Amino acid sequence: MISPDLPAALKSALEARLHGQSRRDAGERAGRISASYRSGGNSGTITSEADAIAYATVRMPATYAAVAASLNALMQANPDFAPASLLDVGAGPGTASFAAAEAFSSLASYSAMDSNPALRSLAMALADDATRLRGLTYALGPARTLLDRAERADLVIASYMIGELTEVERAATIDALLARTNGTLLIVEPGTPAGYQRIIAARDRLIATGAHVAAPCPHAAACPLIAPDWCHFVQRLARSRAHRELKGADVPFEDEKFSFIALTRQPASQRPGARVLAQPLVTKVGATAKLCRADGTAAVVSIPRRDKPAFAAARRWDWGDGVTPP
């Protein structure tokens, strides 16, 4: 399992590029870009090196944490998966590539694609500072076009990118993502109701083509959650001093909400029997947890303290864990 925090070398390389820039200006740039994303915009608002560095300083730690948590769930479900090649689609500053490099020592080939020149330049500069990623190839252009001529990869990741596409583009791109996948496709989106709906649409579409769910779902049936409920997870990460300064934040940590789906060509070898869908409640009486279960149902289960083995396990559960249900 890998840490949700940026590797020390990546953190230092990113902060070195921020050195000498006005923190106030960088914070304002990051704020404008984030506001554009929240209102439905895309990376087109990132037009310069200064924009890319400011945005990466503020958002790269959180997106890295979400991808890392998703990869951890994948590794739990499929511990023998040892990809040799990665395709990072909508790669931005290379966040998912760095997370995958931490997760899989087997990776030897890294390819990325994105339509934003400023983010590509930053990714290539950061990759040059990282031994594992120095051979990164990074194509510039629309994902849908580039995917048609991309090499297949053992691991394909699309993190925080399908939400930037129109509905028609999204369906075609999701099909193309799976077509380029030899082993596992991981899609990560913001943990909002809209992000969850995009994940569910991709899940349903790709299951229908024969893909297998590795994580987070312990089953391939329809999602049992009913609106206004939705499946999402939370990953806590540490904020660096630069991160806090640019966000104007005092709290030394951040909680990133995300939704994801990991789909495989072959069934996962150790998919857990249940997934914890919210932070469990532990009291003097026992533990209560909301679980998505292998039979395709979701339920709140109670584990009494008197059931010592089951309670000992349940009291250690966290939101997002794959567990053995009582």
Can you say where each PLM-predicted feature lies in the sequence?
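Class I SAM-dependent methyltransferase Rossmann-like catalytic core
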Residues: 45-69
